[in-house]
């Protein structure tokens, strides 16, 4: 079935007029001299496969879409027909088929031909000729069986993503701009969430010793040019030293050392009573050494917390105390004046001197004087 279809496709019944006129230019080996043709071999024209099969003609149209139609003559759109099976074999087997000088040097079509020849390698290794294995009615694409496969362009190699580096081990100068911004944001979150106000101020002083911070500031902007390798090293060591885990360890060590010192200092009942009286007057003289040590530690922790108050908080406390004192003084003065008025009214009522007293209201309308009055005359 395939051989009959192959012969029907390559060996039509009627001779073609184009090749019948050019029979003298075909050599014995079957090479076609196409120097008289003014066409350019370019990409195959995608016509209807059934129409091209029925017309028994292999159309190779010329002049690609990049060439203006005004610059191409009518001969450029002529078709080359292969009417003999031997000629078709010779065309396929000839290695020098692309060496035909179809156009004179310097013409527009020669430039297009050179550009196409660099894109399409017309060697036998690139041709993949396939014969249809079934009838056309079965849906096989004749065009895909005849047109040689175009070599696909090589895919661009995908760029490998940079691995995420450990920024805690890199110096400041070895980081890129994006890594510096990312690390600054990481430090800001870590310091603001895990450390207190004093530690934050210390880190700001390390980064920018000339920074001026007011009590009303709620944020501090870190400039990238302020940091260096040495400053970043100091900040890392400070954060490592004052991390919450290290701070809890130090506080537990201080509490244990203070408790051992207080228990060793208290030796008798007299010493315990004196320490208790120094801490609070409400404690009894006969309290044990453990009670006195706990009271003294509580008092010291309270004074330590008071000393850690910020200046703004202490100022607010002083203002509230001052306002409460002024309010008490005003209430005391008002109460004193009310008592004095009540006492005076009682005296007047007991004396009886003001029983016939009448209160008159006088209203005086002042008239506008035309001129000034000299009171000295």
UniProtKB/Swiss-Prot annotation:
Coiled-coil residue windows: 321-350
Region entry Disordered, spans: 240-348
Taxonomy, superkingdom: Eukaryota
InterPro entries, sorted: FAM199X_fam
Low complexity compositional bias, start-end: 256-301
Keywords: Coiled coil
Biased composition (Basic and acidic residues): 240-254, 339-348
Keyword Coiled coil: yes
Coiled coil found in the keyword field: yes
Residue ranges with Basic residues bias: 319-338
Cited PANTHER family: PROTEIN FAM199X
Similarity annotation: Belongs to the FAM199 family.
Protein name per its UniProtKB record: Protein FAM199X-A
Species this chain originates from: Xenopus laevis
């Amino acid at each position: 079935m395939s051989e009959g279809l192959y012969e029907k496709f390559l060996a039509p019944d009627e001779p073609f007029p184009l090749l019948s006129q050019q029979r003298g230019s075909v050599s014995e080996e079957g090479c076609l001299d196409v120097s008289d043709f003014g066409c350019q071999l370019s990409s195959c024209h995608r016509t209807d496969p059934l129409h091209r099969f029925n017309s028994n003609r292999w159309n190779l149209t010329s002049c690609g879409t990049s060439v203006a139609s005004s610059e191409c003559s009518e001969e450029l759109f002529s078709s080359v027909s292969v009417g003999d099976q031997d000629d078709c074999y010779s065309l396929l087997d000839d290695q020098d088929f692309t060496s035909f000088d179809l156009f004179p040097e310097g013409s527009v079509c020669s430039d297009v031909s050179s550009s196409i020849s660099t894109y399409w390698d017309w060697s036998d290794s690139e041709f993949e000729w396939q014969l249809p294995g079934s009838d056309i009615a079965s849906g096989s694409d004749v065009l895909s069986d005849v047109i040689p496969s175009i070599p696909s362009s090589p895919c661009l190699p995908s760029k490998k993503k940079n691995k995420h580096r450990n920024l805690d081990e890199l110096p400041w100068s070895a980081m890129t701009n994006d890594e510096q911004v990312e690390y600054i944001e990481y430090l800001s979150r870590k310091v603001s969430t895990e450390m207190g106000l004093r530690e934050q101020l210390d880190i700001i002083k390390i980064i920018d010793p000339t920074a001026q911070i007011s009590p009303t500031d709620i944020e501090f902007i870190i400039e990238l040019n302020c940091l260096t390798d040495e400053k970043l090293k100091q900040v890392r060591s400070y954060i490592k030293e004052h991390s919450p885990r290290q701070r809890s360890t130090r506080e537990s060590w201080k509490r244990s050392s203070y408790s051992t010192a207080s228990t060793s200092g208290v030796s008798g009942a007299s010493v315990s009573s004196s320490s208790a009286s120094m801490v609070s007057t409400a404690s009894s003289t006969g309290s044990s050494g453990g009670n006195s040590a706990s009271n003294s530690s509580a008092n010291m922790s309270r004074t330590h917390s008071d000393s850690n108050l910020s200046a703004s908080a202490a100022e607010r406390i002083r203002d509230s105390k001052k306002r409460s004192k002024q309010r008490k003084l005003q209430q005391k003065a008002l109460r004193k004046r009310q008592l004095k008025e009540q006492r005076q009214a009682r005296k007047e009522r007991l004396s009886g001197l003001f029983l016939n007293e009448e209160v008159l209201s006088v209203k005086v309308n002042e008239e506008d004087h035309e001129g000034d009055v000299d009171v000295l005359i």
